[in-house]
Amino acid sequence: MNDKAKSILDIRQILGLLPHRYPFLLVDRVLDYTPGECITAVKNVTMNEPFFQGHFPDVPVMPGVLIMEALAQAGGILVVKSTDTSVEGKLFLFTGMERVRFRKPVYPGDRLELHCRLLRHKLKLWKMEGKAYVDGQLAAEAEMTAAVMNREDM
């Protein structure tokens, strides 16, 4: 592989990288990533999502906090693919979000494209810029900070 190792990850591979499971796994596919730099992933939003039962029954809109979680999960995959460390016994935890903006509602049937770019990494902390798009239009954005922790230290 060259310096810009481009790959595609399907749901089976994602399940091996993230601890999340239904109904909280919010990344369906990774379209592209460059270790230590960036990732592009997808969440296909369907009317079958459990959160649409109450948010909102007559006008279903994906909750903004779940858009942020989808970005965080994409960022978690980027972190895992950017280190030589095994994911066994590790958790990727949000430690902060800044400059959060919701620009466009996300509806059932939308394909949420998740872009994360690594800004910096120091010890166990990772800072990323995340942007979520629907049909090429910015739906949400944030700067996110996360930590990689050992499960036994929790």
Swiss-Prot record:
User: Where is this chain's protein located in or outside the cell?
Assistant: Cytoplasm
- Reaction it catalyzes: a (3R)-hydroxyacyl-[ACP] = a (2E)-enoyl-[ACP] + H2O
Record keyword Lipid biosynthesis present = yes
Lineage top rank: taxon: Bacteria
Principal localization reads: cytoplasm
Keywords in UniProt for this one? Cytoplasm, Lipid A biosynthesis, Lipid biosynthesis, Lipid metabolism, Lyase
Task: List the NCBIfam families hit by this protein, alphabetically.
Answer: fabZ, PRK00006.1
What protein does this entry describe? 3-hydroxyacyl-[acyl-carrier-protein] dehydratase FabZ
Q: What is the source species?
A: Oleidesulfovibrio alaskensis (strain ATCC BAA-1058 / DSM 17464 / G20)
